[in-house]
């Protein structure tokens, strides 16, 4: 069995709060493709793989993106250059950057913190999705 890496050897991450201004409602897969294409166009395949972008949460028009700490500047510049999606204009505004999801939600998205176990209890009460 493999041991987990100690915290000093793990990849350092940053969380980015985004606001996407687009005339239609976007889904998570659209946001993922926009971010990856922007990174690919700006810094290539190697830069995109180093950045390791991961969409944590998205509720139109706001989202939370996880990225490698060293590649935050590349992400900022690549998203500022992204200007069209499906031949329609798009604008991606970075609201803020933090090292925890809790701080991103509270400080930039103004969503009060709710402990994870309470979220799970709410989902159990709603029942399974159909």
From Swiss-Prot:
EC number: 3.1.26.5
Localization per record: Cytoplasm
Keyword field contains Cytoplasm: yes
Catalytic activity: Endonucleolytic cleavage of RNA, removing 5'-extranucleotides from tRNA precursor
Chief location of this protein within or outside the cell: cytoplasm
Any GO CC annotation of this UniProt entry: cytoplasm
GO molecular function: ribonuclease P activity
Self-association and partners: Consists of a catalytic RNA component and at least 4-5 protein subunits.
Name of the protein in its database record: Ribonuclease P protein component 2
């Amino acid at each position: 069995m493999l041991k987990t890496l100690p915290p000093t050897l793990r990849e350092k991450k940053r969380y980015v709060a985004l606001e996407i201004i687009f005339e239609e409602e976007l889904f998570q897969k659209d946001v993922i493709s926009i971010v990856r294409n922007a990174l690919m166009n700006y810094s290539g395949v190697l830069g995109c793989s180093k950045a390791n972008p991961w969409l944590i949460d998205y509720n139109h028009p706001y989202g939370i993106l996880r990225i490698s700490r060293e590649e935050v500047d590349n992400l900022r510049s690549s998203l500022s250059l992204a200007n069209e999606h499906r031949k329609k204009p798009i604008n991606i505004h970075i609201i803020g950057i933090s090292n925890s999801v809790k701080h991103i939600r509270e400080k930039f998205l103004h969503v009060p913190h709710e402990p994870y176990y309470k979220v799970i209890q709410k989902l159990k009460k709603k029942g399974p999705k159909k």
